[in-house]
């Protein structure tokens, strides 16, 4: 089992145990990031029925993966709750947004989604990356700080996610009392990587989520909070073997990876291999 082979003492965030490889939620939720292949999201949704999602959760647990990252506003969170009622143990790291940015409607209070995540039993909750960036652009770090303080008050782990290094850097500089950061990291060694005119923190064509990987690695070396790296395969454009190795070598403490059920066993093996051969200078922060 993944967690047993590598031990658990170094895999804890504030006493809560997490596997080094975590299950991303985009594939089961249909967020394909498939560039101009518009049918892929529909294919994902048709494949990942409630039964298939449950099978995926069960297989992940058997392989030693003990956490999944899901939004609280999508129906897949309800599937996870049913899985728990049947005895499932996989932990939820929940994505949430404040009321003024909430997707799906129906949010009255600023922090309704964060309260919902805590109430449903999330092990950790983080501000979703696009929310972080919108609040940063609007110069509303006070809202981010209020989110962090609220989740902390509920005795739940809290984090901040970002695609933009500048947004994350400002959160770190503000010394927010987070338990972890979640930051994108991937190389540009794939065909649809950013072109020279794509200088923003996101690719213009739903094709990039980390425009400055070297700078990210250098900055995260200075951050003493646990780092969950996501989009390490650039939404499926980079094979898992080099993607996992690059992430762990670059200092990530955990890797969040979207996986279909039939990919999980192989991806766990690739993660084992990456950790066995890891060469990193950033200390393990969890």
Region locations from a protein language model:
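N-terminal binding-site loop/beta-alpha segment at the start of enzyme catalytic domains
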Residues: 2-87, 243-246, 285-286
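Structural preference for beta-strand elements that scaffold enzyme active sites
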Residues: 18-22, 66-67, 89-93, 123-126, ...
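Alpha-helix-loop-beta-strand connector modules within alpha/beta enzyme cores
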Residues: 46-55, 76-100, 141-157, 207-225, ...
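Acidic (Asp/Glu)-rich catalytic clusters
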Residues: 58-62, 79-89, 111-121, 172-175, ...
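Active-site-adjacent beta->alpha loops and helix N-cap segments on the catalytic face
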Residues: 72-89, 104-110, 131-148, 165-169, ...
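Glycine/proline-rich, positively charged
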Residues: 98-179, 222-223, 233
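Catalytic alpha/beta core domains of metabolic enzymes, predominantly
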Residues: 159-246, 250, 255-263, 282
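C-terminal helical cap(s) of enzyme catalytic domains, especially alpha/beta-barrels
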Residues: 262-286
């Amino acid at each position: 089992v993944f967690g047993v082979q590598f031990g658990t003492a170094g895999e804890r965030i504030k006493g809560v145990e997490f596997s080094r490889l975590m299950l991303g939620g985009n594939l089961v939720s249909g967020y394909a990031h498939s560039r101009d292949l518009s049918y892929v999201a529909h294919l994902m949704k048709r494949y990942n029925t409630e039964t298939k999602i449950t099978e995926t959760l069960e297989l992940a647990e058997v392989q030693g993966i003990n956490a999944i990252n899901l939004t609280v506003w999508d129906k897949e969170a309800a599937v996870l709750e049913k899985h728990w009622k049947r005895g499932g143990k996989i932990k939820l790291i929940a994505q949430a947004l404040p009321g003024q940015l909430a997707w799906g409607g129906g949010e009255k209070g600023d922090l309704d989604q964060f309260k919902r995540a805590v109430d449903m039993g999330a092990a950790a909750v983080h501000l979703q990356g696009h929310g972080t960036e919108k609040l940063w652009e609007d110069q509303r770090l006070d809202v981010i700080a209020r989110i962090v303080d609220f989740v902390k008050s509920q005795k739940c782990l809290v984090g901040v996610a970002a695609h933009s290094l500048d947004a994350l850097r400002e959160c770190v500089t503000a010394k927010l009392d987070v338990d972890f950061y979640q930051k994108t990291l991937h190389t540009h060694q794939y065909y649809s990587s950013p072109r020279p005119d794509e200088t923003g923190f996101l690719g213009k064509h739903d094709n990039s989520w980390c425009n400055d990987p070297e700078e990210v690695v250098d900055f995260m070396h200075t951050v003493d909070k646990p780092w969950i790296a996501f989009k390490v395969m650039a939404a499926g454009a980079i094979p898992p073997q080099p993607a996992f190795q690059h992430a762990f070598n670059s200092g990530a403490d955990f890797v969040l990876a979207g996986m279909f059920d039939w990919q999980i066993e192989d991806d766990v093996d690739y993660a084992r291999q990456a950790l066995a051969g890891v060469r990193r200078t950033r200390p393990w922060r969890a």
